[in-house]
């Protein structure tokens, strides 16, 4: 909602008639974005989601709203949806015609505000006297959430470490072990919101620590779980 209101404000300030928001989802993001932007003047949202790979509840949360929310089912996986969104943004003619932006974490206006609740969580734990050596465990798919926490850490948030929790789409977990980043087609799991085979925020994490694998592993450890474990 913060991003929706912020975008609406700048649309009014710049005198634009309408901005079109593209968002790829593996489940949770589509629901959150659709409800956050529902009815916001000057914005139309297009939610791209993989056919048969989101839960019925999640699907109903962004396909039944109408108004300024349009859902587009894609015959593929989340990574295909994300690739379509990225292709749209590098098409200059399409951008000029449709005035595109994104509500995925490829847009810094999406993930930077997420850093706020890491500070809030730390403040609450400090009040309870439990903030020493605080470790944050973050379920991770496209890695926007944990990247926001790492940005907060760079801003001075005194969190000791982060744990990136993956399902069997464990590309980042394997990177932590080997130092090699090898994207793969995503596999469908019970934790479908984390079914990402090429997390777009890996590049931000990599750049944040200047590609230093030792430094990355000193702040982030990984965990991976099968459907049976979940």
Give the location of each predicted region.
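PLP-dependent amino-acid enzyme catalytic core
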Residues: 1-230
């Amino acid at each position: 909602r913060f991003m929706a209101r912020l975008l609406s404000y700048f649309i009014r300030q710049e005198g634009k008639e309408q901005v079109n928001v593209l968002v790829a989802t593996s489940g949770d993001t589509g629901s959150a974005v659709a409800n956050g932007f529902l009815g916001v003047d000057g914005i139309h949202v297009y939610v791209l989601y993989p056919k048969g790979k989101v839960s019925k509840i999640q699907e109903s949360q962004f396909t039944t709203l109408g108004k300024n929310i349009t859902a587009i089912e894609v015959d593929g996986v989340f990574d295909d949806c994300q690739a379509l969104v990225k292709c749209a943004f590098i098409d200059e003619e399409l951008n000029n015609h449709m005035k595109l932006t994104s509500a995925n974490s490829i847009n810094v206006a999406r993930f930077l505000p997420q850093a706020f609740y890491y500070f809030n969580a730390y403040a609450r734990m400090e009040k309870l006297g439990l903030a020493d050596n605080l470790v944050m465990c973050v379920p991770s798919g496209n890695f926007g959430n944990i990247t926001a926490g790492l940005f907060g850490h760079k801003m001075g948030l005194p969190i000791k470490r982060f744990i990136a929790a993956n399902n069997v789409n464990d590309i980042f977990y394997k990177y932590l072990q080997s130092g090699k980043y090898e994207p793969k087609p995503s596999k469908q799991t019970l934790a479908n919101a984390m079914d990402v085979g090429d997390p777009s925020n890996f590049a931000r994490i990599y750049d944040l620590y200047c590609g230093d694998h030792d430094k990355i592993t000193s702040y982030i450890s990984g965990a991976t779980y099968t459907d049976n474990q979940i």
